[in-house]
Swiss-Prot record:
UniProt-listed Pfam families: V-ATPase_H_C, V-ATPase_H_N
Entry-linked Gene3D superfamilies: Leucine-rich Repeat Variant (1.25.10.10), V-type ATPase, subunit H, C-terminal domain (1.25.40.150)
Organism: Homo sapiens (Human)
SUPFAM superfamilies: ARM repeat
Modified residues (Phosphoserine): S483
GO terms, molecular function: enzyme regulator activity; proton-transporting ATPase activity, rotational mechanism
GO biological process, one term: Golgi lumen acidification
Tissue expression as described in the entry: Widely expressed.
Name this protein carries in UniProt: V-type proton ATPase subunit H
Topology term for the membrane: Peripheral membrane protein
Lineage of the species this protein comes from: Eukaryota, Metazoa, Chordata, Craniata, Vertebrata
Subunit (UniProt): V-ATPase is a heteromultimeric enzyme made up of two complexes: the ATP-hydrolytic V1 complex and the proton translocation V0 complex. The V1 complex consists of three catalytic AB heterodimers that form a heterohexamer, three peripheral stalks each consisting of EG heterodimers, one central rotor including subunits D and F, and the regulatory subunits C and H. The proton translocation complex V0 consists of the proton transport subunit a, a ring of proteolipid subunits c9c'', rotary subunit d, subunits e and f, and the accessory subunits ATP6AP1/Ac45 and ATP6AP2/PRR. Interacts with AP2M1. (Microbial infection) Interacts with HIV-1 Nef protein.
Record-stated family: Belongs to the V-ATPase H subunit family.
Length: 483
């Protein structure tokens, strides 16, 4: 099992304020174990052990006891969790377990050792707790599961891991719905408390993604789309930081860097960087950018990330950030690294690289390449590369974008492609592009209407010289509107 020594990482296992406050309250309410014994709800053995364990105040005393009675400790805690129904007592037990693990990470082994003796795994003891109603109980169980999974020598796998990751995704998606203004059922939990519980869930994810194997499982579970969904909606800076932290962790794996190319990560992070007022958010975005350029083993992948950053005006942001002073040396080092690498990429940037990067970012604008006759003459056929990858992006933008400038430029580019590539009409029709362009001929924006009309005429007409003369009368209006 591979674990990373993660530079500058905060301890994701630290509880949020609401969990810490509730845990302190729970610790103060001691349990009358004798009454449970008299009611025959627990065994004399478990009652005797838990009372002795509670009396051990110092970490050294606890450690000495656990070294000789680790198996009994795991057995007692699991018996108490499974035989007692009272919520307050279950909370107390989980808090004791969490405190014990936080005090010494190696103590997770007592649960794995006990489970192995019972020919079981540790997960079935804790995963059912995620279905309980009380939010503190649920989130304490989630924290314990993450610690066992991240700190233990045995990986969580198969249906157990899928179940846990699906639970995390559901909790994060509930935050996404709150951010979008959709009503979410939260019971008696206030909005502020709910937000802190979601931060606790994000902390569990941060802990899990420190382990390389879990990164692959998270991506396979469509976890990246979940993260991007949270980032694309309004969320507090702490959750924003935690989600970007998770992306940063994913980008430690070269294979993950390759896989993450298919998501629109760079534009989203560059937007957040532009608006960020928190140094910790700035720091983690720069660290993520650095990982994308540094951990990627394929030159093409590194170049694609660099071009996406250039397209999203990250160079300008870095130049502005360079003028500021930071307490954290990592920020200055990352800024220097990124400026150097992006500067090298700018030198190697061809017009086609520029066009490709702009198109993949989904943020089309009237940059010079779109109007360059030379560009289209030399590069129209290159839009067919990689099974028409760029053309598919172009037609998709015509379908999903609501930005008039993006639609106008996309329609224009479709027209230029069919004008310069002999079989372009057939390709565009097969991709559904012709109908998409025609749909915009009655768009409310004049620029979209004009460029859609022009593209449709290029799809229909064979005599380009005649078409050029026909459109001359409308062209001055367009130029004026564009300026």
């Amino acid at each position: 099992m591979t674990k990373m020594d993660i530079r500058g990482a905060v301890d994701a296992a630290v509880p949020t304020n609401i969990i810490a406050a509730k845990a302190a309250e729970v610790r103060a309410n001691k349990v009358n174990w004798q009454s449970y014994l008299q009611g025959q709800m627990i065994s004399a053995e478990d009652c005797e052990f838990i009372q002795r364990f509670e009396m051990k105040r110092s970490p050294e005393e606890k450690q000495e006891m656990l070294q000789t009675e680790g198996s009994q400790c795991a057995k007692t805690f699991i018996n108490l969790m499974t035989h007692i129904c009272k919520e307050q007592t279950v909370q107390y037990i989980l808090t004791m377990v969490d405190d014990m693990l936080q005090e010494n990470h190696q103590r997770v082994s007592i649960f794995f050792d006990y489970a192995r003796c019972s020919k079981n795994t540790a997960w079935p003891y804790f995963l059912p707790m995620l279905n309980r109603q009380d939010p503190f109980t649920v989130h304490m169980a989630a924290r314990i599961i993450a610690k066992l999974a991240a700190w233990g020598k045995e990986l969580m796998e198969g249906s157990d891991l899928n179940y846990y990751f699906n639970w995390i995704k559901t909790q994060l998606s509930s935050q996404k719905l709150r951010g979008s203004g959709v009503a979410v059922e939260t019971g008696t939990v206030s909005s502020s408390d709910s937000s802190q519980y979601v931060q606790c869930v994000a902390g569990c994810l941060q802990l899990m993604l420190r382990v390389n194997e879990y990164r692959f499982a998270w991506v396979e579970a469509d976890g990246v789309n979940c993260i991007m969904g949270v980032l694309s909606n309004k969320c507090g800076f702490q959750l924003q930081y935690q989600m970007i932290f998770s992306i940063w962790l994913l980008a430690f794996s070269p294979q993950m860097c390759e896989h993450l190319r298919r998501y629109n990560i760079i534009p989203v992070l560059s937007d957040i960087l532009q608006e960020s007022v928190k140094e910790k958010v700035t720091r983690i975005i720069l660290a993520a950018f650095r990982n994308f350029l540094e951990k990627s083993t394929e030159r093409e992948t590194r170049q694609e990330y660099a071009l996406a950053m250039i397209q999203c005006k990250v160079l300008k942001q870095l130049e502005n950030l360079e003028q500021q002073k930071y307490d954290d040396e990592d920020i200055s080092e990352d800024i220097k690294f990124l400026l150097e690498k992006l500067g090298e990429s700018v030198q190697d940037l061809s017009s086609f690289d520029e066009y490709s990067s702009e198109l993949k970012s989904g943020r089309l604008e009237w940059s010079p390449v779109h109007k360059s006759e030379k560009f289209w003459r030399e590069n129209a056929v290159r839009l067919n590369e990689k099974n028409y990858e760029l053309l598919k992006i172009l037609t998709k933008l015509l379908e999903v974008s609501d930005d008039p400038q993006v639609l106008a430029v996309a329609a224009h580019d479709v027209g230029e492609y069919v004008r310069h590539y002999p079989r372009g009409k057939r390709v565009i029709e097969q991709l559904g592009g012709k109908q998409l362009v025609m749909n915009h001929m009655h768009h409310e924006d004049q620029q979209v209407r004009y460029n859609a009309l022009l593209a449709v005429q290029k799809l229909m007409v064979h005599n380009w010289e005649y078409l050029g003369k026909q459109l001359q009368s409308e062209q001055p209006q367009t130029a004026a509107a564009r300026s």
